[in-house]
Amino acid sequence: MIRRGDVYLADLSPVQGSEQGGVRPVVIIQNDTGNKYSPTVIVAAITGRINKAKIPTHVEIEKKKYRLDKDSVILLEQIRTLDKKRLKEKLTYLSDEKMQEVDEALDISLGLHDEVKTQNT
């Protein structure tokens, strides 16, 4: 069963513009009820092209701890809904501590607790 925090290889093509594409690792960020019953999953792209997290929506993951080819960064500004058929192979699972970092970066990316939101109402 697909679970929140799982890292899979997924085929993200076709893409447009600055979207992350090709077969690459993604982390499942959808809740487990959705993962169980929906034909789709919500994921965030992972890249190995950035050595360090550059912005608050980036979360670093270490290759040794998570059995990846290289140190990588989860891009929480690159969120996509995929059909489960795009998921190829489960690579690893992120720790609860790392998922807490993912949640914090998601909060920033989606502006869930953004003070600007309350000022505009």
Curated annotation (Swiss-Prot):
GO biological process, one term: mRNA catabolic process
Group of enzyme by EC: hydrolase
EC number from the UniProt entry: 3.1.-.-
Entry keywords, A to Z: Endonuclease, Hydrolase, Nuclease, RNA-binding, Toxin-antitoxin system
Gene3D superfamilies assigned to the protein according to its UniProt record, in alphabetical order: 2.30.30.110
Annotated GO MF terms: DNA binding; RNA binding; RNA endonuclease activity
InterPro entries documented for this protein: PemK-like (IPR003477), Plasmid_toxin/cell-grow_inhib (IPR011067)
Domain of life: Bacteria
Quaternary organization: Forms a complex with MazE which is no longer active as an endoribonuclease.
Function: Toxic component of a type II toxin-antitoxin (TA) system. Ribosome-independent, sequence-specific endoribonuclease that cleaves mRNA, thus inhibiting protein synthesis and inducing bacterial stasis. It cuts between the first and nucleotides of 5'-UACAU-3' in single-stranded RNA. Neutralized by coexpression with cognate antitoxin MazE.
Stated family: Belongs to the PemK/MazF family.
Name the record gives this protein: Endoribonuclease MazF
Organism: Staphylococcus haemolyticus (strain JCSC1435)
Gene name per UniProt: mazF
